[in-house]
Every structure is written in C-alpha cells, then in structure tokens.
Amino acid sequence: MKETLKLICFNFIFYVLFILFSLIGIPVFSAIVAFQSIFISHRNGMKKFRRAISWYGLVIIKALPYPFVKVIYEDLDKTKTAGPFIFTSNHRSASDPFLMACLPYECVQVVNIWPFKLPILGFMAKLAGYLSVREMPFEEFSKKATGLLNEGVSIITFPEGTRSADGSLGQFHGSIFRVALETGYPVIPICITGNDKIPARGTLLLRPGTIKIHKLSAITYDEYKGFTPYKLKNMVRQLIADEIEAMEGKGNA
C-alpha cells in the first residue's frame, strides 16, 4: 500500500509539473526565440527553435521525474564524424521522443500521426518541421528529409514504426535507409533500455527506474554505399540488438 501511494504521488506531482511547465515554458521559449529571430536569419531562427524544443525535452525527462527516474546518456561514438546525421533508435515507450533531447544536435524527428494531434506539442512539432512518414508518399518524404539534411539538420527516426509491446526489437521499415543511400549522410544507431514502463504501452503511469541511452559509432557512407536498403536496415538493427543485449546484461549483473 505504501509503495502504491508513493507511485500515485509521484505520477500526480510529475503530471502537474509537466502541465505547468508546458503552459509556461513553451510560451516563454517561443517568445525568446521569436524575439531573437528579428535580428537573425530564418535559418538561424529555426536552429534556435529546434534547440529550444530539446531544452524543453531535457527538463521533462531529467528534471521533473528526478529522483524517481534517472536518465543516463552515453556517447560511444569515437569516430568524430561530421554531421548532420540520420539517427535510428529502437522504440519501447511514449517517452522515447522526449529522450532524444539528450542528443546535442539540431534535430527533427520522423514521427507517427498521433504526436501531431497533441495540444500545443503537435503544433510545435509541425512548426519545427517534424515529418510524418505515414501522411506522405515516399518521394515527398525523401525530398523533405533530404532538404533538412542538406541544411545541416539531423533526422531522428524510430524505424520499428511503433512501440514494442514486450520490449523485443521489431522489424525495421526501410524508408529512412533509402534516404540514407540517396543522400550519403552518416547513420548513427541509438539504443534505449530501462523505459519499458516509463510509461508502459497503453498507460500513462510512470514507474521508477533508470533509463540508459547509448549513441553508437557513426556508419559512414563509405561503409554502406554498396548496400541495399534491406541490407543496411538489417545491419543497423543487428547493431542495436547487440548493444541492447549488452546494456541489459550489465544492468542485470
């Protein structure tokens, strides 16, 4: 009973703070960026706006749920490859898009349809140039993704397309890997563990835990230029699967 009450209190406090911070933080961030945009180019204004979204996400995932939920981000990429990048991550929870705020880059995300329907957040995602791959033919998606990459904007994708119900790694869709082969930008696998129940699929209830995020080494075009999209997606999927197994093995040790 005591643990149940503690869990209820944690969730109540988190969601109250989440709503208050969103109602206050989003307008404040937007106003600051809008004011700065008067004196800078549209491109630099968009860069600041996208980074402001990341700062918002960092508060949501690191500050508000602490100390019940801890987020540990590790950059394991020693290649020093220049961006922009195509990030590909496994997908276990609705918290995954927020966790991508740990990446210290200007990014947009490839998302499903439902995030665009969220109040305020959906509008901000559209304004930032987030892409809904299910709402456009591949040619349009590829054109928009290529344009963003050419501007220096990294793209974050969840190629499983939907959250895993049991934590297992699903099959990958090939669209983003076709874009990679067309553009030649580096592909970086991202691995997330520990957030299966933060929150679990089908509920908004957050449970205490430690979330780990590993950014793996970049796969350069020279390494995959002879691949088909099918071969590339399977290679990336295997890299993610192997790292997740190692991460969870360490966690259980």
Q: Language-model segments: which ranges?
A:
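N-terminal membrane-anchoring alpha-helices
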Residues: 1-70
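Non-catalytic C-terminal accessory region of glycerolipid acyltransferases
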Residues: 5-8, 139-253
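Catalytic core of membrane glycerolipid acyltransferases/transacylases, capturing the structured
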Residues: 30-55, 66-67, 79-137
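Short amphipathic alpha-helical segments and helix-helix/interface helices
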Residues: 58-61, 100, 121, 145-146, ...
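Short gly/ser/thr-rich secondary-structure transition/capping motifs
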Residues: 66-74, 136-139, 195-197
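A secondary-structure boundary/capping signal
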Residues: 75, 90, 111-112, 158-159, ...
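Short amphipathic alpha-helix with an adjacent loop that forms part of the alpha/beta core around
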Residues: 75-80, 146-150
